[in-house]
Amino acid sequence: MNLVVVGSGYVGLVSGACLADKGHRVICVDISEERIEGLKRGKVPIYEPGLDAIIARNADTGALSFTTSLPEAMREADIFCIAVGTPPDEDGSADLRHVLAVAREIGQHMERPALIINKSTVPVGTAEKVRAAVDAELAARGVQIEYDVASNPEFLKEGMAIEDFMQPDRIIVGVDSQRARQLLDDLYEPFVKEGARLIHMGVRDAEMAKYAANAMLATRISFMNEIAGLCERLGVDVEHVRLGISTDPRIGDKFLRSGAGYGGSCLPKDVQALASMARSVGFEPMVLNAVERRNQVQKQWLFEKLVEEFGPDMKGRTIALWGLAFKPGTDDMREAPSITLVESLLKAGAQVRAYDPETKDTAPRVMPREAQENCDLVFVKDQYEAVQEADALVLVTEWPQFRSPDIRKLHKGMRGDLIVDGRNMYIPAKVRELGFRYVSVGRS
């Protein structure tokens, strides 16, 4: 099948590359000339394990190509996938300007029957808005063309997106016509043949399913962080509690690790958007409000532990950070807990030395510029360079390379002996036996 994927960000690139790898012909469109020219040269603008190789392989065969011109890409397309951003508006609701702009442009240039698929995370009712936008453009042109609008949300985990797309636990397709259902069945036939479960439902149902899934994941994280806070005060080890509940098959072990809070491009904005959606129809989202509030509080936990040690005035203190990305396996800094921590440390007068194996390009763009210029915030190229003369080491992101550190290098480099573990990577007794003071989440 011939597809156009509009939006060459995280969702668009992963979806386009993987669909091309399954035998479809895909054109990825983006308004950024710099991004498209880079992709044509083989420069992938995001870090995702395996993505570079799959893009290169399919670009070489001609199955995957890139352009800034949507009208040019549309000429032979059967399916248009909208995969543009839906950032939060001031009230937390999803901003649909980019989605509807794409819909209008499709309506302006559509020449034959097609299927429009929303892969962007959008509120319930967005498909109707997309249809209205397309209809208005077709009416302005004085033409009638049959088309369908479907919802096909993605369920990709950053750092595992290729595996998630190629070996999905489910594929949700929201359709309101038999024609749309058949086209989506054809699109995903290669996946179904390999055992993927294709779930059909209405368009509005699919739109809601995406938000509900992310809200549930965020709820599990915030719930476990709340339990961790209680464990700290009662002298209980939250890791033992986690083991005790996660082995119950009704609960399972996914998204039950306490830590410094969740971030990324999905959970924070989707919880806000779902809560906003609820309020817009007169329904008070009490659980969602609590999930978001707990996460905001949890993001301050690392800084609060440092204040307990050094006091609120940290002038003359150097704090080393291991990890900046919101999770391992990605360079994504959106809503990362490290941002909250760095801003608080700088405000308290501390100097910060930070290392992350993948955020050399993304972190400097979102961290305070003035602090970088006056060297109060320094990004280093090695985890042991980060700890030089540090009064404390804070583990922010649980990259595998931090799991078994060289203790000799830590003792030699650090001025202090405090380790604050925001991801519970280490065993408290062992760290203390090695001569460090150790603080972790929900453990005494």
Question: What are these model-predicted stretches?
Answer:
Residues M1-S444:
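Structural/interface elements that position substrates and couple domains in central-metabolism enzymes
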